[in-house]
């Protein structure tokens, strides 16, 4: 929002997205990107769980971010054809089980 690169100490389950921007990349984003959607870790985990429950595919948290954004902003994308690439070689099964359990407990409360 400030128009310049600012350092951030993000803490997220989507650790594959924790990268630094260089000035060249930032200038492309500033010129070409009209909107950036954000999602919470809980929304990411819900998207991961949906993919698992419906498709029996385990995806890494970073891969679930676009689906989480679609789920959060249904009205923005209603009636549109959307494609999402699912990937996920960076998956720790024990960690995913823990995330699903934590998310399940939060949804019960």
PLM segments and residue spans:
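PLP-dependent amino-acid enzyme catalytic core
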Residues: 1-109
